Amino acid sequence: MEKQKNVGHIVQIFGPVIDVQFPNEHMPAILSALEVKINDESIIFEVAQHLGEGIVRAIAMSMTYNLSKGLEVYDTGSQISVPVGKQVLSRMFNVLGQPIDGGKPLDSFIKNPIHAKAPTYLEQKATSEILVTGIKVIDLLIPFIKGGKIGLFGGAGVGKTVLVQELINNIASKHGGLSVFAGVGERSREGNDLYFEMKKAGVLDKTALVFGQMNEPPGARMRVALSALTMAEYFRDYENQDVLLFIDNIFRFTQAGSEVSTLLGRIPSTVGYQPTLSTEMGQLQERITSTIRGSITSVQAVYVPADDITDPAPATTFSHLDAKTVLDRGIAALGIYPAVDPLASSSRALEPNIVGKKHYLVAKKVVQILQRFKELQDIIAILGVDELSESDKQVVARARRIRNFLSQPFFVAQKFSGIQGQFIKIQDTVNNFDELLSGKYDNIPEEAFLYVGTIDQALEKAKKMGWSEKN
């Protein structure tokens, strides 16, 4: 901060936004960081607009309780920058890269600005390697691509955060790479729980966490994903690592952008969102990619307002994703978790030349049976199962077993469910569903397939329920 020369004064304050008067010849650049010092406390702002006559409009990255007109504002001469490199691992940061875990201050470290250009087309690298998650419904029907972007779509309370936490647990412990978690506009309690869960699981030393929670100003929530991405990019570009970037929740990034847009006086677009929605989303998503040096695989939870998948916020996110995992309230209501809707979800990796012919055919047969089961729902509701043809009765019975078998006990939920978490190998998943489709287990009670990892466990559960092979 010794290089600060440019000094302005606050001329207007409205919530988390301030107008600052600078000398005409020394106006700070757009995206520059400004600093206000009050009683040994430093508040950082980011320049968003030039209003003319030396006045700039800036957005706060922290609360603005003690501000008053006339206070001095210092132009730092650079963008907001965050620490990068191995020192950020096992630590928790805010949007400015300041540690918030109560640990010791960082020693000497490198800082990178949070705004950067996306890798050029020539720098990017296409890959078709599958990232095994150990979660049956995902590995079978919606396989994730290493270096791809994955979206977890769902309304409130259907299990997005739990699924993200399970993916962190499974991939970080099995994959062995580095992870960066961005908590964007979600609950502080969830961030706290995640930190201690990761510490307990022994994966914290390979993870950096960055939080801009729902109680923070929109500026912090809008920029925290960029702060986390900057840390991930350093590991990819300078350490040649394969990095996992988890964002919970990408909708809050859009929501914060909408709040900031309104504060800046922009005319809203469709459903009240900012007119720059597609641009802002693109600037973030285009930086999340694989290059010739390393990869970033991104898993993003996407809140769906009022369960409306056509809402502009989730719809804009859709176009950037390689796999779409849709969580359904109806499936959650049946007590089946993860509440993934296999018919609404999709992945561009589900191709025979990527996953193999057997995997592809088994997945397609599973989807066909579930689709036919869905078509029969209205008939069943009106006339009952007894009025169906024998072939349709078989479809219904098999589909119910498949639906139950797509459930799975999670490691991160075992303290609540009392059921040991399961990591299932992808080959076991494919073989188990192949046997299930063949009708080999049509005589086993459908309840036995709920919350088990493999067919063998389902058989054990059935025997405990009083079923025997003579039945």
Swiss-Prot record:
Keywords: ATP synthesis, ATP-binding, Cell membrane, CF(1), Hydrogen ion transport, Ion transport, Membrane, Nucleotide-binding, Translocase, Transport. One of its GO terms (cellular component) is proton-transporting ATP synthase complex. SMART domains: AAA. The keyword Plastid does not apply. InterPro entries: AAA+_ATPase (IPR003593), ATP-synt_VA_C (IPR055190), ATP_synth_F1_bsu (IPR005722), ATPase_a/bsu_AS (IPR020003), ATPase_alpha/beta_chains (IPR050053), ATPase_F1/V1/A1_a/bsu_N (IPR004100), ATPase_F1/V1/A1_a/bsu_N_sf (IPR036121), ATPase_F1/V1/A1_a/bsu_nucl-bd (IPR000194). F-type ATPases have 2 components, CF(1) - the catalytic core - and CF(0) - the membrane proton channel. CF(1) has five subunits: alpha(3), beta(3), gamma(1), delta(1), epsilon(1). CF(0) has three main subunits: a(1), b(2) and c(9-12). The alpha and beta chains form an alternating ring which encloses part of the gamma chain. CF(1) is attached to CF(0) by a central stalk formed by the gamma and epsilon chains, while a peripheral stalk is formed by the delta and b chains. Belongs to the ATPase alpha/beta chains family. PANTHER family: ATP SYNTHASE (PTHR15184), ATP SYNTHASE SUBUNIT BETA, MITOCHONDRIAL (PTHR15184:SF71). This is ATP synthase subunit beta. It comes from Mesomycoplasma hyopneumoniae (strain J / ATCC 25934 / NCTC 10110).
